[in-house]
Amino acid sequence: MAFNVSALGFGDNVVDRYEHIHTMYPGGNAVNFAVYAKKCGAARSAYMGIFGNDAAAEHVIASLEDEDVELAKCKQLIGANGASRVTVVDGDRVFLGSNEGGIRGDARYVLDRFDLSYMKQFDVVHSGNYCFTERELPKLKAAGITVSFDFSDDSTDEYYEQIAPYVDFAFFS
């Protein structure tokens, strides 16, 4: 069942490398948002962010293409894709470390007027506190773009005060 809703995930993409089973899964808050929007029936779903040029990046790209998530405004740069090391202890996921977003942590997405024009085509743009998109949020607000934002469960009061004025829907996962 399709709904006349369009959703864009803007920001992070990573692979979670589950060391105990030697398996790599695509993820990241913005990627997961785009995939689940599509799976839940959004008529249009897209992801916009920066990929590295390694096997991890290609895995995420292929997975998004398999899910029919639009990638038209993504960038691919030379460098490692975001990756985290994960295991499971007593049934709970435990993060062992990460490369801090890989190339995406070093080369931040800077929105221009063409990006904003594209983003205005969506009912909601979703980002989060691990997306490295904070400095672009005022541009989204000024353009009248509806923003949802996941603060996760480890943001500070100062961070909330800095980001909340640019957010229409806040989540704390």
Model-derived regions: residue spans:
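Conserved N-terminal subdomain of the carbohydrate kinase-like
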Residues: 15-20, 42-123
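Residues at the starts of beta-strands that form the adenosine-phosphate
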Residues: 6, 43-46, 70, 145-146, ...
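Short, acidic/turn-prone active-site loops that include or flank metal/cofactor-
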Residues: 28-31, 100-102, 151-156
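Positively charged, low-complexity intrinsically disordered leader regions
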Residues: 1-22
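Histidine-anchored nucleotide/phosphate-binding helix
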Residues: 30-39
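A short, glycine/small-residue-rich beta-strand->loop->alpha-helix junction that serves as a flexible
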Residues: 21-29
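Conserved beta-alpha-beta core of the PfkB/ribokinase-like small-molecule kinase fold
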Residues: 124-173
